[in-house]
Regions:
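C-terminal transmembrane helical hairpin of 12-TM major facilitator-type secondary transporters
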Residues: 204, 222-277
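Intracellular juxtamembrane helix-capping segments at the cytosolic ends
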Residues: 65-78, 85-86, 269-282
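Helix-loop-helix hairpin linking two adjacent transmembrane segments in secondary transporters
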Residues: 93-136
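Extracytoplasmic gate region of multi-pass secondary transporters
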Residues: 101, 158-216, 271, 275, ...
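Helix-to-loop junctions at the C-terminal end of transmembrane segments
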Residues: 2-14, 211-225
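C-terminal ends and interior cores of transmembrane alpha-helices
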Residues: 24-44, 237-250
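Hydrophobic core of transmembrane alpha-helices in multi-pass small-molecule transporters
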Residues: 28, 44-65, 169, 254-269
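A late C-terminal transmembrane helix in Major Facilitator Superfamily
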Residues: 97, 281-316
């Protein structure tokens, strides 16, 4: 949620934002390590509360600000291909998981959980500070002199913006509903542990490639919303096919594998294409603010995605029912993309003087 509120600050000073992102992220990580190290002394309740503070709040603030900071800058550097720019930025966010997860597992096994956090604090601090010093806008770029403001609540009165937020929310909810249960789905389908590790590496790669692939593809389309329609149709088709043949319960490995690849690619592509789609509808003015508010859908989807799967499994005990529900949600998202999201550029920002006069 920090991304939803930090947008105006990032617009004003991108360098200060990147520094705060670095300090909050690494301070939260170091604090988490300390909580784990002294958990016996602190007690379970106090340790849990402090981990929530450091890992959930402080580190989360750094994560949200750090996610937004490079997006507009890269869109300015790639002004003729903004989808490629956002794809590079957001692919880095997704690819980091594929790289960091095995490193974290190795460190935890060799030096323990608390020391893992301390080592990663140093590594991330160096990398994020390097990014902070290298970050700059293109030579000759001048921000517009007229300051604009965005009323976060009024954003959702705009049909196009509300439609974009909702279809993004559905895409992330569906993605998390499947991705968070990837391992048990693969186990039930009959994959061995070695094969599961390989498949999860490939789905992570599909997620990363979807981020740069779909957003770059949007640069070559008349309407960037067509990317979302493509994602939803692909997910509907593969989910319907997997349901029709009972791929999970009958162990049809190829169909399960393709379904996970497609959903992961669409999940990643939904993230990376979002800022380019928003800029095509509402311009570059305050894009960090507008994009940040749209990312609140990610926060809500994080609460609903895996819970949706858990609810369906508790009620029916079948992954096939999960898959067909997701196909229905993807269909709703496609209809929103087709009939609710407008095609024309609109004005969401108003001059600050006008805003204060209200």
């Amino acid at each position: 949620m920090s991304a939803a509120f930090a947008g105006p600050f990032i617009e004003r000073n991108i360098h200060k934002a990147s520094l705060i992102a670095c300090l909050c992220f690494t301070a939260g990580m170091a604090g988490t390590g300390l909580c784990i190290r002294y958990s016996t002394m602190l007690g379970t309740g106090l340790t849990t509360a402090r981990i929530f503070l450091f890992y959930g709040c402080i580190m989360g603030i750094g994560l949200g600000i750090g996610y937004l900071t490079p997006v507009k800058t890269l869109m300015l550097w790639f002004k003729d291909n903004p989808g490629l720019g956002t794809g590079i930025s957001i692919m880095g966010f997704g690819l980091a998981k594929a790289i960091a997860s095995p490193v974290m597992n190795t460190l935890q096994g060799r030096i323990g959980l608390a020391n893992m956090f301390f080592v990663l604090t140093g590594v991330y601090f160096l990398m994020m500070m390097l990014g902070h010093f290298l970050l700059k806008k293109p030579e000759g770029w001048v921000e517009p002199q007229v300051k604009n403001t965005v009323n976060r609540l009024k954003l959702f009165r705009n049909k196009t913006y509300a439609g974009i937020w909702l279809m993004f929310y559905i895409n992330i909810t569906c993605g998390l509903a499947l991705i968070s249960y990837e391992k048990p789905i693969l186990q039930l389908a009959g994959f061995g542990m070695a094969a599961i590790s390989v498949v999860q590496s490939l789905t992570a790669a599909s997620n990363a490639l979807g981020r740069i692939g779909f957003s770059t593809f949007s640069d070559h389309l008349k309407d960037r919303n067509s990317v979302y329609k493509t994602i939803f149709l692909l997910c509907i088709g593969t989910a319907a096919a997997a349901f029709a043949v009972s791929a999970v319960s009958k162990g049809i490995l190829a169909v399960v594998f393709i379904l996970l690849l497609v959903v992961n690619a669409g999940y990643g592509g939904g993230f990376s294409t979002l800022p380019a789609l928003l800029s095509s509808r509402f311009g570059m003015k305050n894009i960090s603010s507008i994009h940040g508010v749209a990312l609140s859908a990610w926060a809500f989807a994080g609460l609903s995605g895996n819970q949706l799967t858990a609810l369906i499994l508790r009620m029916t005990g079948s992954y096939e029912n999960v898959i067909i529900v997701l196909a229905g949600l993807y269909l709703i998202a496609f209809l929103i993309a087709q009939f609710v999201v407008g095609t024309e550029e609109q004005e969401l920002c108003v001059p600050s003087g006008a805003a204060s006069a209200e």
